[in-house]
Amino acid sequence: MYQRMLRCGAELGSPGGGGGGAGGRLALLWIVPLTLSGLLGVAWGASSLGAHHIHHFHGSSKHHSVPIAIYRSPASLRGGHAGTTYIFSKGGGQITYKWPPNDRPSTRADRLAIGFSTVQKEAVLVRVDSSSGLGDYLELHIHQGKIGVKFNVGTDDIAIEESNAIINDGKYHVVRFTRSGGNATLQVDSWPVIERYPAGNNDNERLAIARQRIPYRLGRVVDEWLLDKGRQLTIFNSQATIIIGGKEQGQPFQGQLSGLYYNGLKVLNMAAENDANIAIVGNVRLVGEVPSSMTTESTATAMQSEMSTSIMETTTTLATSTARRGNSPTKEPVSQTTDDILVASAECPSDDEDIDPCEPSSGGLANPTRAGGREPYPGSAEVIRESSSTTGMVVGIVAAAALCILILLYAMYKYRNRDEGSYHVDESRNYISNSAQSNGAVVKEKQPSSAKSANKNKKNKDKEYYV
């Protein structure tokens, strides 16, 4: 298209196309708008691209109240009810998930992630138990205001705790736990990952430790049993129940729990969907899909009022409405955390920089912000949407091309009519000149003037000059 337009401009600029100066001016008439329109289209596309950048800056502070590590979550975990939140009020409550008897898993590795806010110093958040008689379990708890995990997969109780982070401050926190055999890792928010490697780094060494606890007099029968048991010392056998809330353990949790993920199960989402394998008892109330991350003042007020349902509900509603309206001049920014952050962190616990540019089902990752400041948290994602920018650029280029074609057609039409008029005028002049040459009378009238000039030349020749 552009080559054809250039050829048309060259023809108009040639001597046979309407004059060199006029053709040059005509070329400028459509080249300049073409350039300007193209730049406009590119600028439009660039502005669309810039409008869809979400910049989250990286910081270095460790003391904060929301998660910073955002990992790539599997595609199967990005739908559904993201960030389902339950409030456990005064008196405690409990959400229990039971595996069907014929579908109880035995796992060598486990992954657990959950968001919460509370002011309690002692509570049990989540506990997973094996079938009756096996004794395997995994428990996430708060002890003296510190978060920790305790589990047993066939030998002794193994404990791991984050002793540096205070989590009973009423702020929103995220905890991630992974287990592989007897080894475990624990991370709270953006604090460094804590690793726990118990004595006996392989099955044989751990089997030897277990054998020492069995009386020797039991003999060969026990040895054979230990050999079989040794292959299971790293396996969480026949998991039967997931208990959320700690009421059954005598340490009921009071506060908010959000987005629980355990080995592919999003239990709180299932509870909100009235799953047949889930039972809810006690003072437990569903809040909504967006976990409310409350400020220190609002959460402390709610907790000091004995976790009143009405106060907690009002605070949560206020936080949710504030998040929808955006940052208010008089309110602190409200952070939001979706299940994508929790679930993905459990799926990829060793990769802190694997950030997903794709969008969650609800329209983008949340922007974690500090509860008492304006600065975003480190490790956040930069999400770029290029579809709108591409559309804007294409529309701009098409508009520029259409405008240039219209200008070129109008200019060609105008100069074509002007050239035809000039041709008629030149033809009439040639006709008058030819008629004058063919008219004998007119020629005769001009003959006396020619005779006079001849006589004058003769007189000049007759003159004599003297020096």
UniProtKB/Swiss-Prot annotation:
The stretches that face the Cytoplasmic side, renumbered to this chain, are 413-467
Q: How is this protein situated with respect to the membrane?
A: Single-pass type I membrane protein
Ranges where the record places region Disordered: 318-380, 434-467
Q: Which UniProt keywords apply?
A: Angiogenesis, Calcium, Cell adhesion, Cell membrane, Cell projection, Glycoprotein, Heparan sulfate, Membrane, Metal-binding, Phosphoprotein, Proteoglycan, Repeat, Signal, Synapse, Transmembrane, Transmembrane helix
Known InterPro entries for this protein? ConA-like_dom_sf (IPR013320), Laminin_G (IPR001791), Neurexin-like (IPR003585), Neurexin-related_CASP (IPR050372), Syndecan/Neurexin_dom (IPR027789)
* Signal peptide range in chain numbering: 1-45
The Gene Ontology biological process annotation of the record reads: angiogenesis; cell adhesion
**Localization:** Presynaptic cell membrane
Q: Which residues carry this modification: Phosphoserine?
A: S449, S450, S453
- Compositional bias of type Polar residues: which residue ranges? 324-339
Give all residue intervals belonging to the Laminin G-like domain.
86-284
How this chain assembles, per its entry, is: The cytoplasmic C-terminal region binds to CASK. Binds NLGN1, NLGN2 and NLGN3, DAG1 (alpha-dystroglycan) and alpha-latrotoxin. Binding to neuroligins is calcium-dependent, and the binding preference ranks as follow: NLGN1 > NLGN4 >> NLGN3 > NLGN2. Interacts with CBLN2 and more weakly with CBLN4. Interacts with CBLN1; interaction is CBLN1 hexamer form-dependent; CBLN1-binding is calcium-independent; isoform 1b does not interact with CBLN1. Interacts with CLSTN3.
Family of the protein in this entry: Belongs to the neurexin family.
Q: What is this protein called?
A: Neurexin-1-beta
State the organism named in the record: Bos taurus (Bovine)
What gene name is given for the protein in this entry?
NRXN1
